[in-house]
Amino acid sequence: FLPLILRKIVTAL
């Protein structure tokens, strides 16, 4: 998993 995608998921929370 890329950090960019992971951060986007965290921001969606």
Swiss-Prot record:
> Which intervals of the chain form a coiled coil?
none
Q: Keyword check for Membrane, yes or no.
A: yes
Q: Name one GO cellular component term.
A: other organism cell membrane
Please tell me whether the keyword RNA-binding is annotated for this protein: no
Alphabetically sorted, this entry's keywords are:
Amidation, Antibiotic, Antimicrobial, Chemotaxis, G-protein coupled receptor impairing toxin, Immunity, Innate immunity, Mast cell degranulation, Membrane, Secreted, Target cell membrane, Target membrane, Toxin
Q: Which GO terms describe its biological process?
A: chemotaxis; defense response to bacterium; innate immune response
What GO molecular-function term can you cite, just one?
toxin activity
Tissue-level expression: Expressed by the venom gland.
Modification Leucine amide occurs at: L13
* Consequence of substituting L4K: In crabrolin-plus; increase in antimicrobial activity and gain of ability to interact with LPS
According to the record, mutating R7F results in: In crabrolin-minus; decrease in antimicrobial activity
Q: State its location(s).
A: Secreted; Target cell membrane
Upon changing K8W, the result is:
In crabrolin-minus; decrease in antimicrobial activity
Share any extra remarks. Negative results: does not interact with lipopolysaccharide (LPS). Has no antibacterial activity towards some Gram-negative bacteria (P.aeruginosa, P.mirabilis, K.pneumoniae) (MIC>600 ug/ml).
Q: What does this protein do?
A: Antimicrobial and mast cell degranulating peptide. Shows low antimicrobial activity towards some Gram-negative bacteria (E.coli MIC=300 ug/ml, S.typhimurium MIC=300 ug/ml) and all Gram-positive bacteria tested (B.subtilis MIC=300 ug/ml, S.aureus MIC=300 ug/ml, E.faecalis MIC=150 ug/ml, and E.faecium MIC=75 ug/ml). May act by permeabilizing membranes, since it permeabilizes liposomes composed by phosphatidylethanolamine(PE)/phosphatidylglycerol(PG) and cardiolipin(CL)/phosphatidylglycerol(PG), which mimic the membranes of Gram-negative and Gram-positive bacteria, respectively.
UniProt family annotation: Belongs to the MCD family. Crabrolin subfamily.
Spell out the protein name for this chain.
Answer: Crabrolin
Q: Which organism is it from?
A: Vespa crabro (European hornet)
